[in-house]
Amino acid sequence: MKLKSLFTGFFVFGLLSQGFAAAAQDKVLIDFKQQGVESRIKDNGPDTKFAIVGGLNGNVLEVTNTPGTNGYPGVKIAPDGAVWDLSQNSRVEADITNLSDTNITICLRVDNPGDWQTNPWNGENLSLAAGKSGTAKVNFGYSWGNPGFKLDPSKVSMVMLFTTKPKKEIKFRVDAIRAAGKAGEKPKGSIEKVKPKDGVILEFTKGFSENQIDNRGSKTVIAGNSAQITFSTEPKDKWPGAFFKTPEGVIWDLSGCNQVEFTITNNGSKPARIFCRVDNNNADGKKHCANADATIEAGAKKTVIVPFVTDKIWDGEVKNSGFVFSSADVKGFLVFVEQNGEEKKITLDPVKAVAAKGPTMPEWLGKKPPVDGKWTLTFEDNFDGTTLDMTKWTLPNIRENITEDTFPIEIEGEKSWWGSPSVHVAKNASVEGGFLKLKTDKPKEIPEALPKFKDIKYTTTVVTTFGKFTQKYGYFESRMKLPTTVGMWPAFWLMPDRGKDAGIWWKRQDTTNGGMEFDIMEYLVRYGAYHYNAAFHWDGYKEKHKSIGTESIYFYTDKDGFLTSGLLWEPGKITLYCNGNVVGTWKNDRIASVPEYIMYTMPIGGWGAGCNVDDSKLPAYFTVDYVRVWQKDEWK
């Protein structure tokens, strides 16, 4: 599982605005001239000092950060009461001057109450040269220029100003902090993500503007609800085409789909090979795009399908290998041909994005490993009973039963180590109808028998083979149905277990010295329904931590809505499988060489923005149909 930083992304440069002009609707959040105002300001650690001092236009706040242990030194400013009600405004602004002799970047953060691990804030950075002034702006609902946490402006509980850990002493002055803008205003240059209604992304009737057409060696005429495209025959236009881009300020979010369909009629007198492409920013035909082509007979109509599920394979030894594309960030569609001197004309009907079922799964899937050899089935659970087989699995245990060998996450009521605070509860794992189900929920209250944590809202569980089954090398496969509730973070993964002779649990599970975390299938619901990642972590989780992986494994589900993920682990080599197809490989001497055990988890959260839980969709379930492990005789 990826370990996320408290301040992920804080240092992407934000939108800057110079000058300290105040509008009529501005609301002062803190008056530095007010007696006793210091009580509303706190440092963010021992490496920050602050003072209210006299300025040219009244009192100001001076903040000094020094090198030390705090990675994000700065100040926290509280309201004069429980919260600020800024529902009449659209943003918070801070007028800041850099008093240092070096360039600095200051983050302005605006918070709602709540668990910090759910990131209930918006933030923006301001970069200032030595001696320069500027205004940092945080627009409600946006962070670092992109849509972020949906902040409630009526419940602003804190404003923070901080920097990264400085190499030498730095100082900045805050002249004013205010709420500004009218409620509902969007920041200039902001982007709205739009999901297709009824699957239709691009239609040519109401709402379509011809400004969305970029003719690249073509002529396009809108006729009814279709586009008539005539491609150039000029020798200079080798690949003439028409690009249909999103409206200004819009990105198409196709994360709920796994392919795009272009219905095209060939109006020419000869067969024509038509290329269709779905583009992100910076698409170059190989990266940041998905594409397909088809030959259409003269006078015929055909649907060209551009799948997000491709045969491009991630290679851990090749930078930016595999399928580099984001279905949630589509900027437009390109329809083009290869020019051969013959006139080509087509009609393009409305373009649709769909969630299609995949082809029939390979016959071998679930029955044997994907490569030949002398294999033995060493572990299997089809979850056909009514209770979990405790000879194979470990669940969160009551505290009275724990020993020094107990892995802390397997203690009933222990906090989840990943994502938003939740507690592990054994009863959240159940076996029914031939499936293992991991449940994450928000109960009205945490059961009395469990330890009380003031920030705990959710219950989840963890199911592992720790202390019951381990294996070095082999093929590990599981068929799973993923949850649909935003905020869920299910995973099928392996961790080291060197056995009791290695000592206390953390020595058994150390990812150094031949150990490694294998994230075979790791899924954030916010990615969309057909997209997961695989990752590998080693050498601990602190300064020496290393990782590699891919975030672009797109897939079809089978007829029942399941996917099957597999890992072929060989000495010095791993191969990733999705629904029986190779999706990734990595050859490296550092690949794990110690036994590993199986884990299923579904914490809340993840990395990046958009991981907040939709409580109305709870409980959420991560469903496992089976898990099977084979060992090759030569590795026993």
Predicted regions located by residue number:
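General helical structural elements
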Residues: L6-T8, F262, K632
